[in-house]
């Protein structure tokens, strides 16, 4: 059956217009400057998501004295942002299955940018507490929905590198927050960190005119002619108006368009039960460790080791640079090692490093810097790679929902982690903080190694029917 609304490109393929045809055309597209452009545009939003998420870590040391902050209030202020992110991740993930990946991404950017501006206007602890909580809604929703969007444009071969080179912008945003925090907070004041975080409001205004909706999502919703039209436009760009021949279309598994809306229970049916539970553990273990360390280390250097503010921020910057190096290595190697193997090895490397720091005592700031940097090199790569892996293990009909609900465990871990640090430091000493982190990381490695699903080199519709 040939539908009258389909484009000439679709009619020339010889496969009836349907989900399988859209998938086959996406899989035959070579990575091109168009894909890089899409990755960069979405990456700008993700860069500022990371920047805004970590900005609080570099603002807090400047507020300890003026606002008379106790360790308990610091931990609560850090944690409450992640509570907002938890709600935002689930809510915006649900919305992305209803109204689309791109429209939802625009809403998340507008939310976190506007609230960053309000954070800059905070006049006391309570106002910053409220604004930071609300900002978390947008911060929690943007990355998993954007990751689903980028995944749905990627073909099986080289998908790990393609997606992770986009995701790499997140740790770059973390490093940028550290660099700018090191310079801006002592020089201009803490409010400017939040003002910088409001800049992507401009992107929210123009994003829908810069990029199209995901054809995979449109096809899964039965909007085949829209998916065909968008894909034909991209094919024309990639082929330079037909001057460059595209590879032939290969047959793909037949996948029906979704006949009913996805419900939460679908995440726990059939093969997706074990996948969901395993990936939740991976998210929790990686972010409990990484966010617990990155948000608290500037303050720990300031309060326990009595560093002046610039030196405390400098040491924290070095750890983030180590994390950036680890994520870059992951982006280059994960299509070779596979997802499951990388997760197991990185959790083991990070967990053993943290256990070593507990063993030697964590009494010297340079020792803390060394061991924490090695650990961060490994575990921060997992924090990045789960944004690649999670969309791969769910079908299009629930890809954004599954990714967003899984990322909610990031928010749970990030909310609990800083509070655990504050409690453990006060009650049991600094060294035991790293013991807790190390044990959590090792548990994550065992679960990933035993129950992870290998997805490298496989078409999304094959991995998740």
Enumerate the language-model features and the residues they cover.
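Transmembrane-helix signature of 12-pass secondary carriers
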Residues: 1-465
């Amino acid at each position: 059956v040939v539908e009258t609304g389909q484009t000439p490109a679709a009619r020339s393929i010889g496969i009836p217009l349907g989900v399988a045809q859209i998938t086959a055309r996406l899989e035959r597209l070579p990575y091109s400057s168009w894909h890089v452009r899409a990755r960069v545009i979405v990456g700008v939003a993700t860069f500022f998501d990371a920047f805004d998420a970590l900005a609080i870590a570099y603002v807090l040391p400047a507020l300890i004295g003026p606002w008379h902050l106790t360790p308990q209030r610091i931990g609560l202020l850090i944690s409450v942002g992640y509570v907002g992110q938890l709600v935002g991740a689930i809510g915006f993930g649900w919305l992305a299955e209803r109204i689309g990946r791109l429209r939802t991404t625009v809403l998340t950017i507008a939310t976190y940018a506007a609230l960053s501006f309000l954070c800059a206007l905070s006049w006391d602890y309570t106002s910053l507490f409220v604004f930071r909580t609300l900002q978390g809604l947008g911060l929690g929703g943007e990355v998993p929905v954007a990751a689903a969007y980028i995944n749905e444009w990627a073909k099986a071969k080289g998908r790990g590198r393609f997606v992770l080179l986009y995701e790499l912008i997140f740790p770059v945003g973390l490093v940028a927050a550290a660099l700018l925090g090191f310079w801006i907070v002592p020089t201009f004041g803490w409010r400017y960190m939040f003002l910088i975080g409001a800049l992507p409001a401009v992107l929210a205004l123009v994003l829908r005119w810069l990029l199209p909706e995901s054809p995979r999502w449109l096809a899964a919703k039965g909007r085949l002619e829209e998916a065909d039209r968008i894909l034909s436009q991209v094919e024309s760009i990639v082929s330079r108006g037909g001057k460059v021949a595209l590879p032939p279309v290969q047959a793909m598994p037949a996948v029906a368009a979704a006949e009913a809306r996805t419900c939460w229970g679908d995440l726990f049916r059939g093969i997706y039960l074990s996948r969901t539970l395993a990936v939740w553990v991976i998210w929790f273990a990686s972010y409990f460790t990484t966010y617990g360390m990155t948000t608290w280390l500037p303050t720990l250097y300031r309060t326990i080791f009595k560093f002046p503010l610039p030196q405390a921020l400098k040491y924290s910057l070095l750890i983030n640079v180590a994390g950036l190096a680890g994520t870059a290595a992951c982006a280059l190697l994960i299509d070779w090692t596979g997802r499951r193997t990388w997760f197991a090895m990185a959790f083991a490397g990070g967990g053993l490093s943290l256990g070593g720091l507990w063993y030697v005592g964590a009494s010297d700031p340079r020792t803390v810097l060394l061991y924490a940097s090695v650990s961060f090199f490994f575990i921060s790569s997992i924090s990045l790679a789960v944004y690649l892996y999670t969309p791969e293990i769910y079908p299009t009909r629930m890809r954004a929902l599954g990714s967003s609900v899984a990322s909610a465990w990031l928010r749970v871990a990030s909310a609990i982690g800083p509070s655990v640090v504050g409690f453990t430091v006060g009650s049991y000493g600094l060294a035991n903080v790293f013991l807790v982190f190390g044990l959590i990381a090792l548990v994550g490695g065992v679960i990933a190694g035993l129950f992870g699903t290998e997805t490298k080199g496989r078409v999304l519709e094959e991995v998740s029917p």
